[in-house]
Regions:
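A short beta-sheet element
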Residues: 49-50, 61, 67-130
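DNA target-recognition patches
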Residues: 36-67
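Extended intrinsically disordered, low-complexity coil regions enriched in Ser, Thr, Gly, Ala
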Residues: 179-194, 202-205
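A short glycine-rich beta-alpha junction/loop motif
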Residues: 3-7, 106-110, 141-166
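Extracellular/lumenal glycan-associated surfaces
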Residues: 7, 166-178, 182-185, 221-223
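Charged, alpha-helix-forming regions
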Residues: 10, 139, 197, 204-212
Length: 224
């Protein structure tokens, strides 16, 4: 843990030192669902697993649904952070994502842990810092790829006041929204480029492309 009591950059209205606190002092945890292969079906209750977490986002990937009558764990809530706590791949331990909107009929799997806090956007940003990665590395089991509740209880972080937490959380929420917006623009441009590459070059057997700049009408020549 660093001895610095304040960050190098902060909003100007805040001057108080950050306090060193245990993770369990400012978050609560909830467990995932244990199910059997016979509980799985084509639809029902969605069970979020490590495959549903990618780059800090919840994604549709290798979705698993179980019969609703076997569900004995609570539904995820908006703001919850779900964390991979056990996996065959050591590098996936600690991977996490925040639930950005209400997801009905959705729980987490047994190899996940849910985290709730008073300021989830700040907590999510905190878990994105290198310090959280360091805490995971220090507390992870030597032979089993997992983080237990006891290991979480040993983790410590510097924490600001709740008002500063909210300001920081809002700042990173806005950054995430901006990144998402530009990502969508990027994906659209990639699709435009792919389409233009297909239409601005002649297809097999054709001498002119489907789309070309006006002012050009000559056939394209076959050349080596």
């Amino acid at each position: 843990m660093s001895n610095h009591k304040t960050p190098s950059i902060r909003f100007k209205e805040f001057t108080d030192d950050w306090e060193q606190r245990k993770l369990t002092d400012f978050v609560s945890f909830f467990s995932g669902l244990t199910y059997t292969p016979s509980d799985i079906q084509e639809n029902g209750t969605l069970v979020l697993r490590s495959s549903n977490v990618s780059d800090g986002e919840i994604i549709d990937a290798d979705n698993v649904y179980v019969r609703s009558e076997v569900v004995n764990s609570e539904n995820v809530q908006e703001g919850d952070i779900i964390v991979v706590v056990r996996n065959g791949s050591r590098s996936l331990i600690g991977k996490h994502a925040q639930i950005k909107h209400f997801m009905p009929n959705t729980v987490i799997g047994a190899f996940m842990t849910g985290i709730r806090s008073e300021c989830p956007s700040f907590t999510n940003a905190l878990l994105n810092t290198p310090h959280f990665d360091e805490e995971i590395a220090m507390n992870m089991g030597a032979t089993i790829n997992q983080i237990t509740g006891y290991m979480f209880s040993k983790m410590e972080f510097r924490m600001p006041s709740l008002s500063e937490q909210k300001k920081i959380g809002s700042f990173f929420d806005n950054l995430d929204n901006l990144i998402t917006l530009h990502q969508r623009k990027y994906e659209k441009l990639v699709n435009v480029k792919k389409s233009m590459l297909d239409k601005m070059f002649p297809k097999n057997g054709k001498k002119v492309p489907e789309i070309r700049f006006k002012g050009f009408t000559d056939d394209w020549e076959q050349r080596k």
